[in-house]
Amino acid sequence: VARLRDIHVDAEHVGRVTQICEKMPSPLPLPMRLWHLRRRRDAFGFALRALMFDDPISDDEAAEALGADLVSRLVEVGLLTRRAQGRLASPFHLGLIGSGFLFSDDLQQVEDGVMGSGRTTRGLCAAGVPTRHVDSALDLGCGAGAVAIALSERATRVVATDVNPRAIELARFNAALNGIANIDFRLGDLFEPVAEEAFDVIVSQPPFISRPPDTRPQTWLHGGERGDELPRRLLSALVPRLRESGRAVIMVEWPEVDNEPLEQRVGDALGADSSAARVLLLKAERTRVDEHCTAYAFGLRREPSPEFASTATLWRDHFERMGVQTLQLTLNVIERGLPAWKASVEVRPLGASQLKASHIDHLVATRGLLAAGRDALLGSTLRVPEGASFLEVASGRVRVTFADVLEPIEITKGAAALVANVHEAATVRDAIEALAPTLGVPLDEGREKALDGVRQAVTFGVLLSLP
């Protein structure tokens, strides 16, 4: 770890490499990234080629990158292996999680391997790691341990579970690699390893990819025939595993079927426990199944192959039979506590924003005000999100653009004026009392009209409560 940091294998420098062709699906960017790395001829380039990009290097290059003694030890423990002409590369994939390092399997080479840290996992860590220190946290389905390692900085005790024994072994190794000692690794399916325990925080990215008939199941990938069977099973047992006011952040790409509202599907999965839960669905990118099938069929292989077209077609036929046309990537935020409520918010694609736990804190607190009732809303202090801008785009219409994670929206000029007044007032009640007489209707009617406008602004994220 010290050597990797010495040669600048960190988020900033590795990010400059992964930005190359970053909008292209894996593995299309690989040739261009390697082209740039091979031109560097320095320790950083050699290390990334051997440890991150499966591009064998010579003994001299390995020694320059890592030092001869360390290379010998890595070969001895199997983190570097000999390839053609005796060149060296890792059979694993080295990734980054925060300031730490994470070894995972090359999923194209290892049968039912262990997933590491990709774009969605990094987004899940940013959203799921709490803003305050907590006593206990659970990484459910830990894979190589990325989320557990991130949680270990904010939790006194972390439990990490997985149904795959190889995942537990690799995650335990990664924790030791990063000098982390407060993670308890347990083998088992979903909540079985934690029995009757409850946690302050639960974070999970369960497998949610659909599995067509007659295809080989992969533990890290498939969530069932439709893809959401495993996530729904997880949600059905979730709330009792949370402490009072505990929060779960569960990432799922939900197949959209028969125009069934996502709020209803999540509520049905939670069952009777939904009456004791606050549910906030953060809807990120929506993907058409044509793109989904193409990306996954191609991404499971290092390069185009004769099986690519047949695999993509098999997946597409499967979705057609189920009536699925789109998939919705969603961060499902569930808190245990009253009053119970459900809400959903459109957010930017995870690759275009960094949705953090602090954003979720604000959104949950604000929606909680609506559920708490009229008096709570009137007595609250609401503010426009930091960095939001208001631009008149048409007669009577104003476009609101957010600096963080929410999608832009349009509101009326009257609504924008109301928002500005609430933003400047000590409380919502003060703003309404000042505005109501100017609305040209009886005073009580004006108060209700203004309060309804505040509710709408809160619903769309134009006004937020400070948690």
Describe each region flagged by the PLM:
Residues 289-366:
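Flexible, glycine-/basic-rich loop-and-beta segments that form/coincide
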Residues 82-131:
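Class I SAM-dependent transferase core
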Residues 165-166, 204-233:
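Mobile active-site "lid"/loop adjacent to the S-adenosyl-L-methionine
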Residues 118-204, 210, 255:
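Conserved SAM/SAH cofactor-binding pocket of Class I
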Residues 1-46, 86, 110, 339-420, ...:
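Acidic, low-complexity/disordered tracts enriched in E/D and polar residues
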Residues 43-91, 125, 129, 138, ...:
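Long, charge-rich, low-complexity alpha-helical segments
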Residues 164, 227-283:
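Conserved Class I SAM-dependent methyltransferase catalytic core
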